[in-house]
């Protein structure tokens, strides 16, 4: 049996029912990860299930949504401006920086960096944004102030993607991530304008096509952020729903898999198809 973790969270209270499902409950093919989880946050509150939602997984690039949430919080407080231009050099560029590498001469605004970090998963953009808030520890402190005492960021891109077994650095638990994401997207932590901006960036994600988006029926809404790391790690956090509007938050992480990247993408797409079928 493979371990799955799913949590369903109402808009005001968290309810969890723990259970184990056989592998045949989800139509997965070519799967052999040591760990795989699903985290489902249901604002409608009709289905309440969880599968071991309190085990740590590497966040990988899914942390970039939390980072931009922290940046927007500073904007709301008058401590930052989305239009502020940040200049950087060749020495600042790290692996996988498809947007920032094109703007060495003119720099990028904070708004443009957040867009690059979320929609293209640009690693240099994330590091530059981390610098604006004071580094990984300050992002962790921001999350603690939100009530999330689980999620932590310790390193910068790309080292945070190592995904070493039993290493708590740069990890979260599915329940914590779903609750924190819901607070950022629907709570009072950010202004309405900032909440809308965050979900707009996620809706414009350009690198998660083979995952949940590939399983969506016509007319469904999705705003998401994927992540990939070492040691077979893959993940996605998303707000999605029918009729063109989000109604649930889904968080899926896997690590320790021997599957190829394409196989891991198919795993997540197939999980998404099962969730949608039983919506």
Region spans (language model):
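Structured C-terminal helix/loop/strand segments within mature extracytoplasmic catalytic/sensor domains
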Residues: 22-30, 47-48, 55, 131-132, ...
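Short amphipathic, helix-prone segments within low-complexity/disordered or flexible regions
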Residues: 3-8, 14
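Mid-domain, small-residue-enriched loop/turn segments at the edges of structured enzyme/sensor domains
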Residues: 127-186
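Short, glycine/proline-biased beta-turn/loop segments that scaffold the active-site neighborhood
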Residues: 77-102
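Active-site SXXK
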Residues: 57-86, 250
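Conserved catalytic neighborhood of penicillin-recognizing serine enzymes
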Residues: 93-128, 136
């Amino acid at each position: 049996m493979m371990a799955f973790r799913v949590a369903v969270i109402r808009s005001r209270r968290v309810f969890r029912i723990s259970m184990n499902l056989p592998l045949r409950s989800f139509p997965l093919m070519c799967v052999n990860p040591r760990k795989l989880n699903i985290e489902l946050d249901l604002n409608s509150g009709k289905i309440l299930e969880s599968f071991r939602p309190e085990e740590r997984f590497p966040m990988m690039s899914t942390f970039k949504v939390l980072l931009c949430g922290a940046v927007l919080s500073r904007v709301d407080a008058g401590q930052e401006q989305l239009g502020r231009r940040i200049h950087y050099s060749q020495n600042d560029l790290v692996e996988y920086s498809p947007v920032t590498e094109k703007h060495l001469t003119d720099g990028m605004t904070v708004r443009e960096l957040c867009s690059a970090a979320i929609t293209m998963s640009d690693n240099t953009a994330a590091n530059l944004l981390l610098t604006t808030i004071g580094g990984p520890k300050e992002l962790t402190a921001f999350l603690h102030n939100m009530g999330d005492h689980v999620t932590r960021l310790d390193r910068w891109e790309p080292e945070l993607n190592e995904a070493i077994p039993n290493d708590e650095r740069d990890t979260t638990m599915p329940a914590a991530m779903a609750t924190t994401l819901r607070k950022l997207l629907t709570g009072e932590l950010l202004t309405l304008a900032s909440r809308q901006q965050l979900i707009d960036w996620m809706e414009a994600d350009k690198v998660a096509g083979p995952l949940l988006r590939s399983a969506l029926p016509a007319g469904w809404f999705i705003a998401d952020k994927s992540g990939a790391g070492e040691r077979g790690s893959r993940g996605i956090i998303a707000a999605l729903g029918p009729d063109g509007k989000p109604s649930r938050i889904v968080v899926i992480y896997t690590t320790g898999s021997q599957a190829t990247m394409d196989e891991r993408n198919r795993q997540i797409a197939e999980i998404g198809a099962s969730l949608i079928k039983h919506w």
